Amino acid sequence: MKRSIIAAAVFSSFFMSAGVFAADVDTGTLTIKGNIAESPCKFEAGGDSVSINMPTVPTSVFEGKAKYSTYDDAVGVTSSMLKISCPKEVAGVKLSLITNDKITGNDKAIASSNDTVGYYLYLGDNSDVLDVSAPFNIESYKTAEGQYAIPFKAKYLKLTDNSVQSGDVLSSLVMRVAQD
C-alpha cells in the first residue's frame, strides 16, 4: 500500500508540473482553413462593354437649375445589354462600380471629363437613380438560369451651382460582378 501511495504521489506531481510548463510557451499555432468553389460569375465576351451615346444639348437647358438637377428630356440608353453568365444557379448576383468616377457627398452622381456636368445612372426602365456607391442587385435582369442582361440609361446631371461649361461629357465606368 505504501508503494502505491508513493507511486500516486510521483505521478500526480509529474502531471502537475507539466501543466505549469504548458502555460509558459513562446510559440502558438494559427490554422487557416479555406475552400475553393466554382468560378464566380463573369461578363460574357461581346457583352462586357457597352456604351450610352447621349444626345447633344445646349448649356441653356441647365440655366436656373440647382446643383444635382437632371435634364430629363435627354435620356441615353445602352446600345446593347451588359451580359453576365454564372456557372450555376446562384443567388444575390450584384454589380459594383470600382472606379473613382463617383462624386464625394453624392452617392448617386457620376463624374465626367466636364467638371460642371456629370450623370445619374439608372437600371433599365427603373426611375430610381442608381446608388453607385454600393453593390446593386441585378436578379430582376435574369434571362435564363445563370444568365443576366442588364440595360442602363443615363441622364445629364448639373454638378455646380454656377453655369455649366460646354464641351465633352465623358465618363468611363469599370464594374465588377459579384455574388453573395
UniProtKB/Swiss-Prot annotation:
UniProt keyword terms in alphabetical order: Signal
Organism superkingdom: Bacteria
The keyword Repressor is assigned to this record: no
Disrupted-gene phenotype: Deletion of the operon under classical laboratory conditions does not result in any major effect on E.coli capacity to form biofilms compared with the wild-type strain.
Family matches, as InterPro entries: Adhesion_dom_fimbrial, Adhesion_dom_fimbrial_sf, Adhesion_dom_sf, Bact_Fimbrial_Adh_Pro
Disulfide bond positions: none
A GO CC term assigned to this protein in UniProt: pilus
GO biological process: cell adhesion; cell adhesion involved in single-species biofilm formation
Signal peptide limits: 1-22
Induction, per UniProt: Expression is negatively regulated by H-NS and subjected to cAMP receptor protein (CRP)-mediated catabolite repression.
Family statement drawn from the similarity comment of this UniProt entry: Belongs to the fimbrial protein family.
Additional detail: The operon is cryptic under classical laboratory conditions, but is functional when constitutively expressed.
Free-text function comment from the UniProt entry: Part of the yehABCD fimbrial operon. Could contribute to adhesion to various surfaces in specific environmental niches.
UniProt-recorded name of the protein: Uncharacterized fimbrial-like protein YehD
Organism of this sequence: Escherichia coli (strain K12)
